Design a protein with these regions (language model features):
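Pyridoxal 5′-phosphate
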Residues: 1-213
Length: 213
């Protein structure tokens, strides 16, 4: 509910920053131009790694690097033109292919048939259309990751931002999951280029892994 968070910030005169990295290219971006600070990263759209953007309003202006006057004086240093062009191309392509949740929903239906007792997080809430997070009925998530890797699929135990952190997820704890259940948490995400067959193959691979573990 970013708009509600923005309203609270406006009430107390605090600039509002929205990290739209997971949003862009997956859902329409109406209203985001009202944010004081808006950031995103283009590798999530299939663009080059290491290139992102910061959009500011007069209320949210911030200078990141001092020195030269590149990029309206906000970030000194020579611009990475090839990556910028690649970023724009990925954004244009992804906006032509705005995703819906049909493939993710098909994946979740198929996995439910193959793995009894699986629990999907936020199933009744508005979610990103190409991300599915779930708690598996048995086995440590690292065993699942290793087995899925051998089957040709890369899945994760959480966001890249949490890599290297010890202990169960504080987010899962806040949602009421026990530390033991949190150790069975797995997340998968797709891109705009993934087809229905890719999602079905991923679901079937989870079924194979379930039988093999």
């Amino acid at each position: 509910p970013w708009s509600e968070a923005q309203a609270l910030c406006r009430e107390v005169g605090v600039p509002f920053h929205c990290d739209a990295t997971q949003w862009l290219g997956r859902m329409p971006g109406e209203g985001l131009d009202s944010c004081d600070l808006l950031t995103g990263s283009f590798h999530k759209l299939g663009g080059p790694k290491g290139i992102g953007f910061l959009r500011t309003s007069s209320e949210g202006s911030v200078r990141l690097l001092y020195g030269g006057q590149q990029e309206a004086g906000l970030r000194a240093g020579t611009e990475n033109v090839p990556s910028i062009l690649g970023a724009l191309a990925s954004l244009e392509e992804s906006m032509r292919e705005i995703a819906d949740s049909s493939n993710r929903d098909l994946f979740e239906k198929r996995v439910t048939e193959l793995i009894p007792g699986i629990q999907f997080l936020g199933a009744a809430a508005k979610r990103l259309p190409l991300v599915s997070s779930f708690v598996l009925p048995k086995f440590d998530n690292l065993r699942w990751i290793n087995r899925m890797d051998r089957l040709g699929f890369a899945v994760s135990t959480g966001s890249a931002c949490s890599t290297g952190r010890g202990g169960p997820s504080h987010v899962l704890a806040a949602m009421g999951y026990s530390p033991e259940a949190a150790r069975r948490f797995v997340r998968v995400s797709g891109g705009w280029s993934n087809e229905t067959d890719d999602w079905i193959a991923l679901a079937d691979a989870f079924g194979v892994a379930y039988e093999e573990l």
